[in-house]
Amino acid sequence: VGAGERSANRSGSEGAKKGKLPYLRKDASDRKGQPKSATTIMLQTNRRGRGRMTSFEQAKEVLKRCFGHDGFRPEQEMAIKAIMGKRDVLAVMSTGAGKSLIYQVPAVALGGTSIVVSPLVSLMSDQVGKLLDLGLHPAFLNNTLSLRAQETVRNRIKNGEFQILYVAPERLSNPAFLSAIENLAIPLVAVD
């Protein structure tokens, strides 16, 4: 999962210094569970003076409000703290361990349109259906859609109407798709 922009001030593992994706390990965090090399970002939450919250606190709020969960699993928390701190993450977890939330929660919390690359058309449809049921704004763009439907989705992409967009890997080389995302704010790209 890429958090969009790389931190200019990287400290931590040798892999990070060499430009490789760091692996999240339990020993890579401090006593509070914060990844050692993550940067905490402060975001304004609203205009009513609620103050400022860290981006991870914002992710916890999204988890509760949008997904109905009270807390993250330990592996999810470590990965999401890193993502919200603008760090790249490679999360290798078993089926059913909650990998999707690792990119879905930050996608909603960060705003803009996050792109999820998935080779599985059935997964795209399933995930979009679940997110729609939660009141979120996802979409998928693949060859199962008619040409007219693909054009409609591309136009809505250009307007920034989606929070999460699922695409197949080959879509990343499609000129019409690249044109549609050209001016988007893309805070996160995930490969699922």
Predicted region positions:
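Short, low-complexity, charge-dense intrinsically disordered segments
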Residues: 3, 7, 11-18, 24-34
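SF2 helicase catalytic motif II
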Residues: 163, 177-192
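Conserved pre-motif I regulatory segment
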Residues: 53-94
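Short, Lys/Arg-enriched N-terminal segments with co-localized hydrophobic residues
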Residues: 36-52
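Walker A/P-loop
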Residues: 86-105, 117
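Conserved nucleic-acid-binding Ia/Ib motif block in the N-terminal RecA-like helicase ATPase lobe
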Residues: 60, 115, 121-167
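Pre-Walker A (Motif I) flank of P-loop NTPase domains
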Residues: 85-91, 112-113, 161-163
